[in-house]
Amino acid sequence: MCQWAATKGTRNHAYEREKLERAFAKILRHRDPSVPPRRSDPRPRKEVARQWRKPHIYSPADLRRMLDIARSYPSPRAALRQENMYTMLLLAYCAGLRRGELARLDLGDVNLGDGTITVRQTKFFKTRILPLPDSVVVSFGPISLHGVGSAHSRLLTPPCSGTNKAVPAPRQEGSPGCLQTSYVVPG
């Protein structure tokens, strides 16, 4: 065990080693109550937790570059990909939405008059209403025009009926309601 303990010097390895030493100390103390209790070292756990909590904050220049790339993302087979990518990035950044929340947004969840968006089926199974900046509300213009008008039309995936003839072409790891789905306009 000493050889294994000395092999790696990562923070996660130190935390795992501390957990293992604590388990062995418990076993020894259970077998022989005269063994003094081992004081655990909280530092490895705190270092691992600190390492995983560091978010990456994009600079305004990085965000502008991502949004410009999303607006010019070429796709001859998916007519609405540019608008979808741009709106997804904007909502993720400005409203703090998660991927699953973005995928489940419906046109009925967006209230352009109030400038709010209703997020349903969140990570903790709650519904919340978020205010949106005017710049984000303006970006919904082109996407809401593609909707058939039903409140249950997906916001970030085009409808498959009406004037837009986009047909879902699911990838191997996706399904039609998933962000991994491509839409093909038959030609």
From Swiss-Prot:
Keyword ATP-binding among UniProt keywords: no
Keywords: DNA recombination, Plasmid
Single GO MF annotation: DNA binding
Family to which the UniProt record says this protein belongs: Belongs to the 'phage' integrase family.
Active site location: R98, K123
Name of this chain's protein: Uncharacterized protein y4gA
Domain annotation Tyr recombinase: ranges: 53-187
Biological process per Gene Ontology, one example term: DNA recombination
SUPFAM superfamilies: DNA breaking-rejoining enzymes
Pfam families: Phage_integrase
